[in-house]
UniProtKB/Swiss-Prot annotation:
The lineage of its organism: Eukaryota, Viridiplantae, Streptophyta, Embryophyta, Tracheophyta. It comes from Oryza sativa subsp. indica. Belongs to the Casparian strip membrane proteins (CASP) family. Residues 39-54, 116-135 are extracellular. The keyword Membrane applies. The chain crosses the membrane at residues 18-38, 55-75, 95-115, 136-156. This is CASP-like protein UU1. Disulfide bonds: none annotated. It comes from the Eukaryota. GO terms for cellular component: plasma membrane.
């Protein structure tokens, strides 16, 4: 068969391309799930006052978004061969990356106020009293940031997809 110059050559995804995509998505799912579990299991009691994630709406949203991100990343990893090259994949990736980034930024903002306080508004740094709780929150934020970066790379790779190999 003779190809004309005006015809575009179809690039086919190799097994390595699919493996990289699946690996990125599974790592994102694992880090996002770990972040949600760390926050949900995190609590500390001092002087009869128990602090856990249900006291702050931003942490409840953070856990919910991380669980949604986990399910999405695992589902797209499982269906990577079929989903690769679909027009909707990049858009769905972008939505999930932005949700994860927004949840991480919101929780990080509350975490920074808890860590350093805000004299102008009269908010005191509570991490001096609840150090273990704040350290676990910081670890969860780091894990969530890793999930954002991993999904961001997967999103960038889905922007110019190669077609899955035909079997």
């Amino acid at each position: 068969m003779v190809e004309l110059e005006s015809q575009e050559a179809v690039t086919v995804a190799s097994t390595a391309d699919i493996a990289v995509d699946v690996s990125l998505r599974l790592l994102a799912a694992a880090t996002s799930l770990a972040s949600a579990v760390v926050v949900a299991a995190n609590h500390q009691q001092r002087w009869g006052v128990r602090v856990d994630f249900t006291l702050f709406q931003v942490w409840i949203g953070f856990v919910a978004v991380n669980l949604v991100c986990t399910v999405y990343a695992a589902a797209t990893a499982a269906a990577a061969r079929k989903a690769m090259g679909r027009w909707w994949l990049h858009h769905a990736d972008a939505v999930v990356v932005n949700l994860e980034a927004a949840a991480t930024a919101g929780a990080g903002a509350i975490g920074s106020i808890a860590m350093w306080g805000n004299e102008a508004s009269g908010w005191y740094a509570v991490c001096r009293l609840y150090r273990r709780y704040c350290n676990a929150g910081a670890a969860a934020l780091a894990l969530s940031l890793a999930a954002v970066l991993l999904l961001g790379v997967a999103c960038a790779r889905s922007r110019y997809p190669k077609m899955p190999p035909t079997t």
